[in-house]
């Protein structure tokens, strides 16, 4: 205030002293002195809102007949995300060369070159003088994220069936093709990486014809890396993929495709509007939970969140609520939303089912003092992935930790990487286990995910009718020269052969029914080793089968180390038990008393190792001829060892568990 008064006083005195000039200010003062460049927040927001409104006006003029929702179907690492980048550049959503894998938001996705979370982007494209609104959904290719894939397909009218020209059709191409075919999607065959020296387009096209019975005469040959022929894709999408069906005048019917957590806005939902319209201020209700919310904002991904006034039937976009949805468990993927008051007039969309965890691990902090940090890290990651189940558990050996459930082994590995890299967590992860079903004689059925809850031998004899384990139908593709080795591997893992087909003279598709427990025990690594890396694997659930499964425990001086117990098939208990005791012995320090390490199934010991104690030479000071004194001292030492064994606790360092649990 004082400064403003001084300026006013100076201006009044200066004008009183000087004659008033008739010249304009820009002639009196040089341009650089007269104008001070500045940028205000209000000005920036006004410019942003003006750009958004221009975009919104252009979208509002496009009827639903000129909407196209499509995705890319491919095996992992066949170039989906790179092709998505080229399409975004082609439609002006991003600048050429400005980013790589725009739709891969997670660090782990960029590091591994895989897509984990389904992402979407809206594009505007002018074709024959008319604007088209295109929604591209980049889906994961790996089997663990099949739920993400199937939900994404439900939002689409068609798909680009992308095949690597050098590698040809592979297992996940086959699995994802049938998933897309079952959803009734229009498929456009596309060959990628045709610029590679190893590319063989004719062989790849022949595989597509024989495997999928597709007409490949109009297949588009592209290079996502260089942009070769990518410009042909969008006109083909417009001409061949049908427009979504919907009516914006009907009551709202909206599918929840995905969700993620924002610190400031709560849970943000990725949605596909089938009928009606949604805008900020509307009150909506979930069919799965019955909970009601007020909409705070709606918008499209362009490629980041871009607010809009309304989302219409046929559009894919995001919404968040005000007050925000704070618990990500409320966002049930595949759920249907409608406006409050229309619940009885709207049919929920079919196909909603909760994702089921099929692989379980226990996670403990390397240092017990870091449990709170691990808990915070796990909770933050679970906010963005509702398919992970979390239960607290405690181990005598490792202290407090968590029992985590995942969709598959890659899902587990990605979560572990994110814990270590994004949150700096130092953790111990136990080997993965799968759930088992216990059918009791009274008809009660219990699913067990923690080996600690597995019934003991006496209960199994007296109360249990049967035990079951989950099976999967595995699809393997590989060159026929490795057929013998692959069949041998599958048989060694208790597999049951179903079909064997040649989809080219040298390529085989083999289908085997395998126990899921065998699959998570590094089956894929062994398969890659048997085929020099040429095999691909995909699988789907195949129900439960009666099995002779047992609980294998590690005992140290007859005390169970609960953290490493596993449920295994009886035929593998002895082999695995020998591996356990041998490996554990390497990492446990010698102590003043004997340490006995055993692997046990119930009361039966299947393997044993002994760590001898340190021994003091009590005879060092005795005369050689003093036999009676020698015997007396040795007996005394033996009695002392018995007392020490009775009261001594084996102290096992965390580093021993870390080394034992590492592969």
Swiss-Prot record:
> What stretch of residues directs this protein to its organelle as a transit peptide?
1-51
According to its UniProt record, the EC number is 3.6.5.-
Under the heading PROSITE patterns, the entry gives: G_TR_1 (PS00301), G_TR_2 (PS51722)
Does the record's keyword annotation contain Membrane? Answer: yes
**InterPro entries, from UniProt?**
EF-4 (IPR006297), EFG_III/V (IPR035647), EFG_V-like (IPR000640), EFTu-like_2 (IPR004161), G_TR_CS (IPR031157), LepA_C_sf (IPR038363), LepA_CTD (IPR013842), LepA_IV (IPR035654)
Job of this protein: Promotes mitochondrial protein synthesis. May act as a fidelity factor of the translation reaction, by catalyzing a one-codon backward translocation of tRNAs on improperly translocated ribosomes. Binds to mitochondrial ribosomes in a GTP-dependent manner.
Instruction: State the protein's name.
Output: Translation factor guf1, mitochondrial
Q: Which gene name belongs to this protein?
A: guf1
